[in-house]
């Protein structure tokens, strides 16, 4: 039974997910359904966390919208995500960047990775 579940999960994994880490800035193109219309909404922000593995893997993206911090958690292999673009690669020394929640303005900048 265990291997049957693994085979089903392996079939659901996406192959078009780029390599990204916490500190990277992403454009996440999300399919949004409003009534009977669907459209693509871009959520641009910094990855502050990536956790889980396999089909259960998720990542959290943080952005500042109208002076309010907004965090959104996405499943990596979700069919709702059209595509993920890596805008820039950040250089950080932590796996979880929760400390960014307390920083404002220039203090919240992340150095570019070469």
Swiss-Prot record:
Domain of life, source organism: Bacteria
Q: What does this protein do?
A: This protein is located at the 30S-50S ribosomal subunit interface and may play a role in the structure and function of the aminoacyl-tRNA binding site.
UniProt-listed PROSITE patterns: RIBOSOMAL_L19 (PS01015)
InterPro entries membership? Ribosomal_bL19 (IPR001857), Ribosomal_bL19_CS (IPR018257), Ribosomal_bL19_sf (IPR038657), Translation_prot_SH3-like_sf (IPR008991)
Q: Which UniProt keywords apply?
A: Ribonucleoprotein, Ribosomal protein
Matches recorded under HAMAP family? Ribosomal_bL19 (MF_00402)
Which first-to-last residue range defines the signal peptide? Answer: none
Q: Which GO terms describe its biological process?
A: translation
| Protein name as catalogued | Large ribosomal subunit protein bL19
The transmembrane segments are none
Which Pfam families would you find in this protein's record? Ribosomal_L19 (PF01245)
Which GO molecular function terms does the record list? structural constituent of ribosome
Q: List the disulfide bonds.
A: none
Question: From which organism does this entry originate?
Answer: Thermobifida fusca (strain YX)
What gene is this protein translated from? rplS
List the GO terms this entry assigns under cellular component, sorted alphabetically.
cytosolic large ribosomal subunit
Which family is annotated? Belongs to the bacterial ribosomal protein bL19 family.
């Amino acid at each position: 039974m265990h291997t049957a579940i693994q085979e089903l999960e392996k079939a659901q994994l996406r192959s078009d997910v780029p390599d990204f880490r916490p500190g990277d800035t992403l454009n996440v193109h999300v399919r949004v359904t409003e009534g009977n219309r669907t459209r693509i909404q871009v959520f641009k922000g910094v990855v502050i966390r990536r956790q889980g593995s396999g089909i259960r893997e998720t990542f959290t993206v943080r952005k500042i919208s109208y002076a309010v911090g907004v965090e959104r958690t996405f499943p990596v292999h979700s069919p709702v995500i059209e595509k993920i673009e890596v805008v820039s690669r950040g250089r950080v020394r932590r796996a979880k960047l929760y400390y960014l929640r307390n920083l404002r303005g220039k203090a919240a900048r992340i150095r570019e990775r070469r």
